[in-house]
Amino acid sequence: MLDTDLCWCGSNKAYKDCHKQFDEHLNSIKLKAFKGQKRPPRNIIKNEKDIEGIRKSGIINNGALDLIASKICAGMDTETINLLAHNYIVEHDGIPACLNYEGYPKSICVSINNVVCHGIPSRDIVLKDGDIVNVDVTTILDGYYADASRMFMIGNVSDKARKLVEVTKECMEIGIKAIKPWGFVGDIGAVVEHHAHKHSYSVVEDLGGHGVGKKFHEEPFVAHFGKKNTGMLLVPGMVLTVEPMINMGARHVVLDPVDEWTIYTKDGSLSAQWEKTVLITETGTEILAD
């Protein structure tokens, strides 16, 4: 690519003024194939317009979660939570990304107690005192996706359940802190797994984070276990989710054979999850949705 050509990232800037220096640095890094190290594909690296689009989508997504935080309580059915999010997103010109995604029937996921993820909202599922609840919301605005989830503790939650929720949030925060430009995806999982195991919890391995922004799910897959200095290289312009699912019991999960969406802990133990959408910058990270 010539210096005066338009950059491959779609910024409409000359290559020399955009990603030339980036490419030179990227190509100078010697990767170790035996550690699964690899360069990211160009199509997952966002330009300034993309980042601003995801940021705006994240503002709506955050607003939906803030609204739910102000309303959620014992006695509320999970379909009401779904409608709160759906209506908020639509009223702000967004689209609920989950609705009809690969056949998913609702606008958000609401996962209670031993449900690890993908709980389907229903009038028949009513929150009770002592429940721990994950609400997972993804918004599309002008073609850009932002994804986040939060845990809510309903009424008088047991000390054991409260600790699981708190440690899971710490796992997410530690995972985000491990993200460094020119580091590796494995750096995230290594610290998350260490922190979870320190508290005698397990990390769900079947599911994880993912690239996000132009699509709901992009490369890379972000495992919340593993070893440092392995996997895809993390570079400025990548956007991904950090969303550890931490179980009080064993890590194994099962899929509901009827709805084919809801995922439970195999042993019936409690599970918790927190999620943020994270941009990798030249100097660290920026949270785009939380």
Residue ranges: model-predicted function:
Residues 3-4, 11-290:
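Active-site neighborhoods and metal-handling regions in enzymes and metal-associated proteins
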